[in-house]
Amino acid sequence: MPVSEFLIHPEYEILLILYRDIFVDEALLKNRFSREFQEAAAAIRLDEMDIKKIGLKEGGNARISGSSKAIVARVIKDQKPHQGYAFMPLSPWSNSLMHFNGENFAAMRVAKVKISHTTLPVTGLQELL
């Protein structure tokens, strides 16, 4: 484990919104354990201002903590500005960050999460199962 992982990276609260993605769905249908599926599904889209504020790099990794679990996902810079909001495709990675209260499935699509810089590798699908 690199020394940088022992340093405290500040966490920022952000609103995470889940969406369906045709490329993730296609990769899932081909092989849910493939590298193609992991690269498409374990990614978080942030705008340029949030990437700079949090200290992330496009293509780098971010640690995202939900109410019950934390994952590591790859950072993608979105073309449109949407400061304070992040987007992830529906997948085992994004679903692990959501909290279901048993009443409203729509509430599972939006959650406040904490995000910070990390040098750890992207969370593997086997770790989520």
Residue ranges and their predicted role:
Residues 1-129:
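Long, contiguous, secondary-structure-rich segments that constitute the structural scaffold
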